[in-house]
Structures are given as C-alpha cells and as structure tokens.
Amino acid sequence: MTDLSRIRNFSIIAHIDHGKSTLADRLIEFCGAIEAREMKAQLLDNMDIERERGITIKAQTVRLNYKAKDGEIYQLNLMDTPGHVDFAYEVSRSLAACEGSILVVDASQGVEAQTLANVYQAIDANHEIVPVLNKIDLPAADVPRVKQQIEDVIGLDASDAVEVSAKSGINIDGVLEAIVTRLPPPKGDAAAPLQALIVDSWYDAYLGVVVLVRVVNGELRTGQKVRFMATGATRELDRVGIFGPKKMLVDRLGPGEMGFVTAAIKDIRDTKVGDTITEEKRLAPTPLPGFKPSIPVVFCGLFPTDAADFEDLRESLGKLALNDASFQFEMESSAALGFGFRCGFLGLLHLEIIQERLEREFNLDLITTAPSVVYRMHMNDGTMKEMHNPADMPDPVKIDRIEEPWIKANIMLPDEYLGGVLQLCTERRGIQKDLTYVGGRAMLVYELPLNEVVFDFYDRLKSISRGYASFDYVLEGYREGDLVKMSILVNNEPVDALAMIVHRTQAEYRGRQLCERLKDLIPRHLFKIPIQAAIGGRVIARETIAALRKDVLAKCYGGDISRKRKLLDKQKEGKKRMRQFGEVEIPQSAFIAALRMGQE
C-alpha cells in the first residue's frame, strides 16, 4: 500500500477541445503506463461515439507511477473529465473523488464559458488548481494575454502557469512536477472502519456490475464482505483492481487510492453513484457526503419503431442508466406511437448521445418525440402539479397559472459577433443582465426561458458566431409565463405525440411552421386532409393536403353526359364517406422529420 504523502488524486478540467484528453495521453505515455505500440490518440475515450465526435462523455480514471525529480516514486490517479455543459454531472463526481485539478486553457483561444463553469465547480470542491496553458506551439498562441485573462476572469494567479503543447509533448514533465509539488496529498486512516465512495458504475457482460471507487478510510480487500450504505445490500468482493489504463487486479486498495471492485452484482440498482461502501463486520458510523443528485432538465419520449422491441428497449435503458447516473426514465404510452418511455436528460447533446448509444450498442431503431421541459401547473384549488409531457396538460379552465424554468446563461464570444447574438437572445425572450469585455472578447450574462434553449438555441448561437461563441448555463428557478398548449390535428384528430407547450406570442409562427412541414411529409390520400394547429378550440394555422383524383371517366369514350355525371356523383359521394370514416396513415418518417423541425 502506498504511503499517503506519495499519492496525488487529480482531475483535468477544461472547455471542449482545449486538449484535455491529449494531455492525458501524454501523461500516460511519459509515465510509461502503456507500451508505445498500444498507444493511440484519446486513449481514455473508449466509446466509439467519443472517438468519432472527438468529445469526452464519460469521466475515465487511470493510475500512473511517476518518478519525481526528488527521487521518490509517486502514485498519480488521473480523472479525465468531459468538457461539455451537458456532462457537468460527470465532472462534479470526478472532482469529489480528487483533491486537486489541472485547468487546461488553450493558449490561442483563452478562457471560455465552460472553463469558468468547471473552475467554479473545482473551487466549490476546495481543490488546489494548477493552470496549464496548452497549444503554445500554435502560431495564434498568445501566452501573456491568456495568463492575464485567467487572472482577470477567473481570479487565479497564473504567473507560474505551466506552458505546454500536449500534441508535440513539450514540457510534459513540468506538468507532472507541478502535480507532485503543488497539489495536496489525500487524507485518510487505514485503521479506521472502511469508507469508500462509489464514483461510477457500469455493466459488464462477464463480471456483472463493475464499481469505480475512491477509498477514503480503511481498505478494500478481495473476499471482504461489504455493505452498500444507501441500499443496505451486502456483497462479497470477488475482484479488486486498478486501471493502469488496462484492468489490473490487486490484493487491496488503501486510503486515498482509486480502483474498481466487482462482487457478482446483477441488479444495477444496488450500486448508487455517490453511495458509501463499508465493511459488514465493522460498519462506518456515517456515510460519506455523496454528490447532489442531478436533475434532468429536458424530457422527451423514446419509442421503438417496432412494438416488439419494447422489452429490449426497457432492458437497454436499465443498462444505460447504470452507466449514466444522470439519465432517468419511466414508462408511457401514446395513441400514435404505442408504448415507450419518458426520459429525462441534462440537455440536448445528452439526449442525442443516449439515443445514438441505444441505436449502436443495443441495435434499436427509435423515434424521439419533441423535447420539452418540466412545467409547474398551479391549479385553482391551490395544488401544484409538475408536467413532463405536454399531452398530459389538464383542462386550461382548472389552471390558475403556469410556471416555466429559467436559466442564467454565460455566453463568451468575439465582440464582432455581438450584434447577432444579442438579437438571438432577445428573440428568445431573454433578459440581459450583464455585458463585460475582456481583451477583444465579450462576456454576456442573460436570463432565458429553458424552453427556448432546448430546441435549437445552441446551434443558432454557433452559426451566428461562426463557431466561436461558447455557452454555459445554470438553472435559476421557475417564473410565471403566458404559456399555452398547441395541439396538432390531422383530419380533425389530435396527434398526441406532436402536442407542445409554447409561448402565446410564438404559437402562430410555430403552428404554421409545423403544419407546412407536415403537409410536405404526409402522403396524399384519396380524400382531402386538413392539418390544423389549435390552441384550445381555436385554430391558429391550417394547411390542406389535396386529394388524389382517380379518373372514373377513363373508360367513357364520348357518350352521354348524364352517364359521366352519374359516375362523378358516385365518386363525390364515396369521397365524402371516405373523409368521414377514412384513417390517415402518418408514416414514421413524417413524425421524425416533424419532431426534428425545432432542432434545425
């Protein structure tokens, strides 16, 4: 077991694309944890989606042994964290397991919105922070300006920031020395009752549930009988190991160390992330402070295109929820789409990633309904209901007022794009709170309704600013809004999957847009199909799909007009009856395209 004074637990935090995972690769390479022939870029990003999109989704851990300049060998436990706003929960869990952070800032781009958000999380976790300036070999790198920015915007002393290039491998030993000399060692007592924090858990087809732990007090050993304090489940450990970066089994894990344990756990609900593991025969007096549970902000329905896949979808969601503690789901049914699940996500990228993982890893074909947020309905009788699905909205007569969630957004961008971004925020009912300039970049603080952000705000922001703006938000609370439920009727029948809550001022525009889209997507039938958007009983937009005409006069060559008239009248009668009883088939592709409308 390593002496506590020679252990360093640290995480790497940064904005998207500032080079966290590349720096992690270089640290692994420098410490010789993996042979050169097995080395590959973004070594710790082991999901296909992560490698393709070039983003980190799951926080990963690895143990490195580093011989420092003072001659001692140090055990470094590294957590590589995601940079995207939707995965902030992964970051908060990683930070809780460490004592220090390396803050990576791109020397050409400077401090971005997500840099700020992650730094504030690290400061809340009482971390010692070492600033590292990456990409110093780029022609556009401006080290003095970025150092000044770190001091002005974040308030960290950047005079002794480590200057590196992770890609070229310049000054990597400088980072390792800074970790050893400037970050604090963990505290803990090997003789105390066992307390180990569950940082993450995932399902392995051979081992059952694999639990990633950080030992605080006591020690974990193979064959030990342990109890999960939140669920009360008891298990005997059959494996104790570390990631280095491959799985390696060890006899024990002591205080301050990170590793994994397995105990033939089948039920994924036994291992709650943030729970404390203790020894069955020497229970710890109190559990460790866990993480604040994440609150989903975006909800949408996931339905299998083939109803026979419903059970597979349920099982797949269970396995994903184990690996992603911030993802929640419950069963729902829809008249248009059959049985499926109402799922809660941290944001739109999170939704997209979960959908893509279900389709790839579990070979499922899915339909996603329009994303919505959680509204609070204050009823006339004084009760308050939360509504996740617009189709479940009670009768408007019974509702006193509706409240919607608002966010406080930090937007950082080059000042030449400021006009377009201000206009975008105003269109989305935003309230400007602050505008400051830091060396050619503007920092905007806006309050916005979350409903306006979940559709396509991020994409629009990126296109207006040519990709230079960065965006981060925190939930502010609920405020009353003039909100209405917009129903879509096809052939006078409401389609529950297309119902949405909109602000009254935007209802007509949204309704017209959706009706026009559906008109192009629903195939023509032998009778006329009206498509309407309605608020309550009032129709606000309408499009009509013309009927296909069957030529009933094809076989009448010349002849008497009354014969033709009889055939035409008979056709007219049939069409009238058809319009009354005919079913309109809305193809799946029309649903998917209509639901994607808001995201374009």
From Swiss-Prot:
EC top class, as a word: hydrolase
Any one GO molecular-function label of the UniProt entry: GTPase activity
Known EC number: 3.6.5.n1
Keyword Metal-binding: no
UniProt-listed Gene3D superfamilies: 3.30.70.240, Elongation factor 4, C-terminal domain, Elongation Factor G (Translational Gtpase), domain 3, P-loop containing nucleotide triphosphate hydrolases, Translation factors
Record-annotated disulphide pairs: none
InterPro entries on file: EF-4 (IPR006297), EFG_III/V (IPR035647), EFG_V-like (IPR000640), EFTu-like_2 (IPR004161), G_TR_CS (IPR031157), LepA_C_sf (IPR038363), LepA_CTD (IPR013842), LepA_IV (IPR035654)
Sorted UniProt keywords: Cell inner membrane, Cell membrane, GTP-binding, Hydrolase, Membrane, Nucleotide-binding, Protein biosynthesis
GO biological process, one term: positive regulation of translation
Natural source organism: Rhodospirillum centenum (strain ATCC 51521 / SW)
Pfam families named in the record: EFG_C, GTP_EFTU, GTP_EFTU_D2, LepA_C
Gene from which the chain derives: lepA
Catalytic activity: GTP + H2O = GDP + phosphate + H(+)
Main location: membrane
Location within or outside the cell: Cell inner membrane
Keyword Cell membrane: yes
Gene Ontology CC annotations of this record: plasma membrane
tr-type G domain residues: 5-187
Protein name, as recorded: Elongation factor 4
Annotated binding of GTP, by residue: 17-22, 134-137
Domain of life according to the entry: Bacteria
Main function: Required for accurate and efficient protein synthesis under certain stress conditions. May act as a fidelity factor of the translation reaction, by catalyzing a one-codon backward translocation of tRNAs on improperly translocated ribosomes. Back-translocation proceeds from a post-translocation (POST) complex to a pre-translocation (PRE) complex, thus giving elongation factor G a second chance to translocate the tRNAs correctly. Binds to ribosomes in a GTP-dependent manner.
Membrane topology: Peripheral membrane protein
Family to which this protein belongs: Belongs to the TRAFAC class translation factor GTPase superfamily. Classic translation factor GTPase family. LepA subfamily.
